[in-house]
Each structure stands twice: as structure tokens, then as C-alpha cells.
């Protein structure tokens, strides 16, 4: 006879920003919950865990913007431009877990190999590598967007050097310092820029191999806007947000002016051309043929579309280090590796190397779900419902074109369809990027997907997603009809495809649009999204997490009011029945 499963009310998979906050929020709102947090790392933090960080790794967000609203981050190891180091972030998340009692609920070095439905359809069974399965009534799948590294496979004959992913760069610091003189870096994501900078600072020779796809290289902002203030501070203002055409912000004066009027669209175009010019001027791509290969596409406004990705040069001397460093860019792909230390390229060249570092990004971390369950959960496009979703997508395209004419004729040639197909065929079809419409419409509140978005302002997004999601899982809020939820998901996906081109075809991507997303979740919760004390601050002063530090108490107040109204209604009905 098989032993009974170890069962929990809630299991959270992932101990990064999203998983820790989801667990804390659940325990705050339902303190008696039997909750477990699982993570396959040796320490908390996810991509910011102790084993994954290295000295030159910094977040792309300035210090006061990269923290939970109610738990200030120490001002330690901050870059000259105000960016937070990986070491500081890891210590912060570890302290957060300890101070909020989450360590007692945590199991590290625990890999979930398979997730499936139990005999009871609202129960989830988790198969654990090298251990007994676990069961739970509610599952919070908070593995995030950076948990499943993409590692290409090539023909290999006699190659003996390490081949690692950028995720493992922290573990290989001693090896690189003592054994590496020449390195091959593969990819054009932000992590490739970080890896190249780190290697050049260590005096290594770098061969940077990046496929010459249509989406082009990563768009890298200067650390400051016009040399006056931190770029992350600038894009966290409502004023800057108004220049980005966004499906989550389609009303109000700024929308009607900047996105609907001819003059407003001219000013919007001028804003983005200026931003692109400042970015290009800071990078000085024209200095060499080598650096010209890193110029974002389209050349005139690459930082607006961000088809290859969008980020910030967090090291003040990044471009000077690059221009002076011993680095060669190869616009091709690796064909094979051989002869102990040789990397063979498709353009016919061969390169000797002491290590290969993949900076090839991340696939969607849904390998634990079988294909049928992935379709049921909206994690992949269901071919059975292809015609229905095609109609929804076509209507969504029309909606986006009507509401946001600035991106109506987006340059679709800047994309790599092969890359899109390899990453789950596009963004999830989830309502508010969190909930499966089909399950929610059936009253199934047993699974939530926080963190599967690409937004630079991670801590605040984690906090709002947690409060929104946990309150729904507890049955405290109802959602719209299935049709409305599916339309919302289709509209968002159509928008992000048009707005961010290749990135939007692969991910729920909204780097410039975090304020409208936060506003949307706040309104859903019945909370006031406008947090500043006056109109000037509301539009021109940066929004930071501490502006939201009272949202949990605010939501509790809303919840108390709702319960009082429910009781009042029940008493009225009871009185009417007595009168009858």
C-alpha cells in the first residue's frame, strides 16, 4: 500500500522576488495556511541567489525603485549612477525571507520535475527529483521568466572546455580568473553585455558570437537621461509613460493627446527619436566596425521598438571598456566545437577558447507540465481551438490599431520567427498575466502564475501580482466572464506583438509600461492608483515602491467594507422574509 502524500494547502514554486512575496502575502491574509516554498537553488533569490551573482552584476533599476514597498533596501554597494549590485539584492532577499518567517516554510535544492492534476481535479501533485511527491490544494507557479536557460546543442568532437550558461557565471568565477585567457560569449541578450563587460574588466580576450537576425541587437540605454537623472527614474514617471502607446492606458487627457491627436503623435515621435539619438551618442556605435554591429534596429528608433530587448548600461564605463577592450564580434552562429578548445563558426572561421558562455536567454519554464496540461493552462497555443483564437487575435489586432494608431504600422520585418516558435509560440493567454480564463470561469481558483512577465520594476510588480492573485485564490474577488477574460488576454498579446515586435511575440513584455499595469491591478483591487500628493508630482516625479507601502492595509479596509455590505444585505433579506 502506498504511503499518503505529504499535503499542503499551498505550494509556491520559486523563491525569487515573486515567490517570496506571494508566500508572504498568503500568510498575511490567511495566517493559518499550511504553506511550502520550493526552489532548486542553494539560497533564496532566484536569479539573484548567492550562487548566481558575480561582482560586476547590477540590476537595471536604481536603488529606491528596486525594493518591496514596506521593506527598504540598504544603501550598500550602489553604482555611481545609483544601480543596485547583485550582492546587495541577494542579501536583501535573504533578510526578507528571515524577517517575515518564510525560512520555516522553505525547502531549497528541491527540483520539481513534474506537475499534474490529482484524482481530485482541484488538487495538484508535484513529483520531486530524488524525493517523494507532494500534494497541494493551491499551486503558485512563481518560477518567473528567467528560470529555464536556453542552451543550444552543436556537433561536438573532442571539445574539453566548459560550456556554461550566463546563469552559472557566478559559480565559475574562480575558474575564469585562473584558467581563462580567451572566452566565447554567445548571444545578444542583456546578460551577454554583462558577461562581456565582466570578462573585459578581468583582462580576457572575448569573441562575441551573435546571430545576425532581423530583430537586431539589444537596445542599451545610457545610465542617465540627458546626463541629468537616472534613466530608470525618468521612465518611472507618468509623464514618460504617456509617450509609450499602451493597451492598458487608453483613456484620459494624455492618452487622447499623445496617442490620438496628430500633434501629440508628432511630439511622441520627437521624444523617441531624441531618446534614440542620446542612446546612440552615448554608445558611439560609429567608432568601429565592431561596435556598429551592436546598433539596435530600426536604426532611427531602435530604443522605442526594442525588438532585440531593452535595458540599461548599468556600468558607467561600459562603452569605454568595450571600445578599449580586446573583443571581436562575429555576426554568425556556432556550427560545431572540436579539437579540445576550438569553436567552429558558420562563416568559416575557427576560434580557440578556454570557455563558452551562453547568453542565449531563457525559455518558458513550463517543462514540468505535460503538453496536454500546458494547453489546458494557456501556456501554449492549443491547436484544437486554433480557429477560435485566430478570430480573437484578428479582432484584437483591429482593436489595437484603432486605439493606438502610432503602432498600427509597426515594422514587422524586425523579428525572428524561428526564435518565437522555440519559446512556447508566444505570450501566455492569461487574464492580467496571472489567471487561466478557462479555469477561472469554471470556479477553479487552484493555480496562479505570477512573475511570467518582462517588466524592469520587478519588486513592485511582484507585490501587486501577489495581492491581486492571493485575494482571488481566497475567493474574495470574482472575475469577469470567460469571454471578457479571453478578449483581455488577446488584446494584450496583440498589443505587445505590435509594440515590442520580436520580444512581444515571445513574451508578456512591457518594459516601458509598468505604471499602466500597476494601475490596472490597483483598480481591480478597489485601490486608488494615484499615490502622489499633487498633480505636478503625479506626472513628473518618479513612482517608487514606497508610494505603495500601505496597500495591504488599504485592501484589508476595502475587504472589511465589502463584508459589512454583504452582512447588511443579508440582514435586509432576512428582515424582508420575516415581514412576509
UniProtKB/Swiss-Prot annotation:
Induction: Expression correlates with the production of depudecin with high levels on oat grain medium, and minimal levels on oat flower medium and complete medium. Keywords: FAD, Flavoprotein, Monooxygenase, NADP, Oxidoreductase. Its cofactor is FAD. Pathway: Polyketide biosynthesis. Its EC number is 1.-.-.-. FAD binds at residues 47-50, 112, 473. One of its GO terms (molecular function) is monooxygenase activity. InterPro entries: FAD/NAD-bd_sf, FMO-like. It is an enzyme of class 1 (oxidoreductase). Disulfide bonds: none annotated. It holds the Pfam family Pyr_redox_3. NADP(+) binds at residues 58-60, 186-205, 222-223, 354-355. Part of the gene cluster that mediates the biosynthesis of depudecin, a highly oxidized eleven-carbon linear polyketide that acts as a histone deacetylase (HDAC) inhibitor and makes a small contribution to pathogenesis. The reducing polyketide synthase DEP5 is the central enzyme in depudecin biosynthesis by yielding the backbone polyketide chain. The monooxygenases DEP2 and DEP4, as well as the uncharacterized protein DEP1, then act as tailoring enzymes to modify the intermediate polyketide chain into depudecin. Belongs to the FAD-binding monooxygenase family. This is FAD-dependent monooxygenase DEP4.
Amino acid at each position: 500500500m502506498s504511503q499518503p502524500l505529504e499535503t499542503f494547502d499551498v505550494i509556491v514554486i520559486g523563491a525569487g522576488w515573486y515567490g517570496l512575496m506571494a508566500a508572504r502575502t498568503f500568510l498575511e491574509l490567511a495566517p493559518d495556511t499550511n504553506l511550502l516554498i520550493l526552489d532548486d537553488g542553494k539560497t533564496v533569490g532566484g536569479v539573484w541567489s548567492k550562487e548566481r551573482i558575480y561582482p560586476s552584476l547590477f540590476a537595471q533599476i536604481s536603488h529606491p525603485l528596486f525594493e518591496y514597498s514596506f521593506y527598504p533596501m540598504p544603501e550598500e554597494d550602489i553604482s555611481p549612477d545609483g544601480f543596485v549590485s547583485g550582492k546587495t539584492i541577494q542579501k536583501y532577499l535573504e533578510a526578507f525571507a528571515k524577517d517575515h518567517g518564510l525560512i520555516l516554510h522553505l525547502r531549497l535544492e528541491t527540483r520539481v520535475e513534474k506537475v499534474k492534476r490529482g484524482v481530485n481535479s482541484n488538487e495538484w501533485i508535484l513529483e520531486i527529483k530524488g524525493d517523494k511527491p507532494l500534494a497541494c490544494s493551491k499551486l503558485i507557479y512563481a518560477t518567473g521568466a528567467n528560470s529555464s536557460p536556453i542552451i543550444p546543442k552543436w556537433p561536438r568532437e573532442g571539445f574539453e572546455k566548459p560550456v556554461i550558461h550566463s546563469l552559472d557565471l557566478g559559480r565559475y568565477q574562480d575558474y575564469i580568473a585562473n584558467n581563462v585567457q580567451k572566452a566565447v560569449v554567445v548571444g545578444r541578450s542583456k546578460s551577454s553585455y554583462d558577461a562581456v563587460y565582466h570578462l573585459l574588466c578581468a583582462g580576457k580576450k572575448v569573441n562575441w558570437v551573435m546571430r545576425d537576425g532581423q530583430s537586431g541587437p539589444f537596445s542599451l540605454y545610457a545610465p542617465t537621461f540627458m546626463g541629468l537623472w537616472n534613466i530608470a527614474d525618468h521612465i518611472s514617471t507618468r509623464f514618460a509613460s504617456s509617450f509609450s502607446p499602451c493597451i492598458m492606458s487608453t483613456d484620459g487627457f494624455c492618452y487622447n493627446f499623445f496617442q490620438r491627436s496628430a500633434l501629440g503623435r508628432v511630439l511622441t515621435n520627437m521624444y523617441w527619436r531624441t531618446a534614440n539619438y542620446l542612446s546612440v551618442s552615448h554608445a558611439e556605435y560609429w567608432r568601429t566596425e565592431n561596435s556598429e554591429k551592436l546598433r539596435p534596429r530600426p536604426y532611427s528608433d531602435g530604443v522605442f521598438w526594442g525588438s532585440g530587448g531593452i535595458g540599461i548600461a548599468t556600468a558607467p564605463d561600459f562603452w569605454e571598456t568595450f571600445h578599449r577592450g580586446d573583443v571581436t564580434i562575429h555576426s554568425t552562429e556556432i556550427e560545431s566545437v572540436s579539437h579540445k578548445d576550438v569553436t567552429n563558426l558558420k562563416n568559416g572561421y575557427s576560434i580557440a577558447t578556454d570557455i563558452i558562455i551562453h547568453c542565449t536567454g531563457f525559455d518558458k519554464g513550463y517543462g514540468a507540465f505535460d503538453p496536454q496540461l500546458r494547453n489546458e493552462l494557456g501556456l501554449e497555443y492549443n491547436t484544437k481551438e486554433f480557429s477560435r483564437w485566430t478570430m480573437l487575435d484578428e479582432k484584437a489586432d483591429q482593436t489595437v490599431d484603432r486605439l493606438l494608431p502610432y503602432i498600427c504600422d509597426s515594422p514587422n520585418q524586425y523579428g525572428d520567427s524561428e526564435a518565437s516558435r522555440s519559446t512556447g509560440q508566444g505570450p501566455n493567454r492569461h487574464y492580467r498575466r496571472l489567471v487561466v480564463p478557462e479555469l477561472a470561469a469554471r470556479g477553479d481558483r487552484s493555480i496562479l502564475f505570477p512573475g511570467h512577465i518582462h517588466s524592469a520594476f520587478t519588486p513592485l510588480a511582484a507585490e501587486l501580482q501577489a495581492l491581486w492573485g492571493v485575494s482571488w485564490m481566497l475567493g474574495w474577488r470574482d472575475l469577469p466572464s470567460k469571454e471578457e477574460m479571453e478578449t483581455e488576454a488577446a488584446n494584450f498579446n496583440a498589443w505587445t506583438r505590435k509594440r515590442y515586435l520580436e520580444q512581444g511575440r515571445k513574451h508578456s513584455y512591457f518594459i516601458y509600461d509598468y505604471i499602466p499595469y500597476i494601475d490596472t491591478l490597483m483598480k481591480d483591487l478597489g485601490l486608488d492608483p494615484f499615490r502622489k500628493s499633487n498633480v505636478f508630482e503625479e506626472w513628473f516625479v518618479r513612482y517608487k515602491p514606497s508610494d505603495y507601502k500601505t496597500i495591504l492595509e488599504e485592501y484589508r479596509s476595502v475587504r472589511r467594507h465589502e463584508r459589512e455590505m454583504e452582512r447588511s444585505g443579508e440582514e435586509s433579506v432576512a428582515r424582508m422574509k420575516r415581514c412576509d
